[in-house]
Amino acid sequence: MSESLEELAAYLKSKLGDKLEETVLAFGELTIVSRLDAITDVLIFVRDDSRCQFINITDISGVDYPCRDKRFDVSYQLLSPRHNLRLRVKVRTDENIPVASACSIYPGAEWYERETYDMYGILFSGHPDLRRILTDYGFEGHPLRKDFPVTGFVECRYDNEAKRVIYEPVVLRQEMRNFDFLSPWEGAQYILPCDEKTKDKR
């Protein structure tokens, strides 16, 4: 399998050349990073070329790296049933620059791109219906971004008296707590309150 991936990596480098920013073969997986303006050409090539035939798209997801200028990775997971190989294609972007939609290349990409937009706010140009798919209509923000608060902004609940769903500011029933768990391998560095057994053993 790894020999097949090494051959495929060399082949893709030779054919796609400057359309690729990076090729990584690690842990038995091949990842290629496409230039943003070349993502359509790269996806069409790996789908149609006889040595690739990655005709199935199994997922599109996002990853947020807030410290980078291009903070988002869009990751396409592709499968070639003919060659029994998998390929990950990545492209990097930010909040304002859209990624070309893969819907015309892989018809199953439509909902994956909507989910990526909903969770991360990544824009896809040429998408036929780019709107939220998992969160509510009035939802503010994108919940899988690293800068999105863990508690969210609002909470919704069904009000039995009003007979409708209502939105309210988040009310925390208790302060955020920091749990200091002990490592079973290191043992306690200090004696916990009310732990006389440990105190007696020392």
Swiss-Prot record:
Q: What is the recorded membrane topology of this protein?
A: Peripheral membrane protein
Q: Which GO terms describe its cellular component?
A: plasma membrane
Principal localization reads membrane
Q: What are the disulfide bonds?
A: none
According to its UniProt record, the EC number is: 7.1.1.-
At the top level of its lineage, which domain of life is listed? Bacteria
Gene3D superfamilies from the entry?
NADH:ubiquinone oxidoreductase, 30kDa subunit
Which Pfam families is this protein grouped with?
Complex1_30kDa
MF annotations from Gene Ontology: NADH dehydrogenase (ubiquinone) activity; NADH:ubiquinone reductase (non-electrogenic) activity; quinone binding
Keyword Cell membrane tagged: yes
Coiled-coil region(s): none
Q: Which PROSITE patterns match?
A: COMPLEX1_30K
Q: Does the keyword Phosphoprotein apply?
A: no
- Please provide the record's keywords in A-Z order: Cell inner membrane, Cell membrane, Membrane, NAD, Quinone, Translocase, Transport, Ubiquinone
Partners and quaternary state?
Answer: NDH-1 is composed of 14 different subunits. Subunits NuoB, C, D, E, F, and G constitute the peripheral sector of the complex.
Physiological role: NDH-1 shuttles electrons from NADH, via FMN and iron-sulfur (Fe-S) centers, to quinones in the respiratory chain. The immediate electron acceptor for the enzyme in this species is believed to be ubiquinone. Couples the redox reaction to proton translocation (for every two electrons transferred, four hydrogen ions are translocated across the cytoplasmic membrane), and thus conserves the redox energy in a proton gradient.
Recorded family membership? Belongs to the complex I 30 kDa subunit family.
Q: Which HAMAP family match?
A: NDH1_NuoC (MF_01357)
What protein name applies here? NADH-quinone oxidoreductase subunit C
Origin organism is Bartonella henselae (strain ATCC 49882 / DSM 28221 / CCUG 30454 / Houston 1)
- Its gene is nuoC
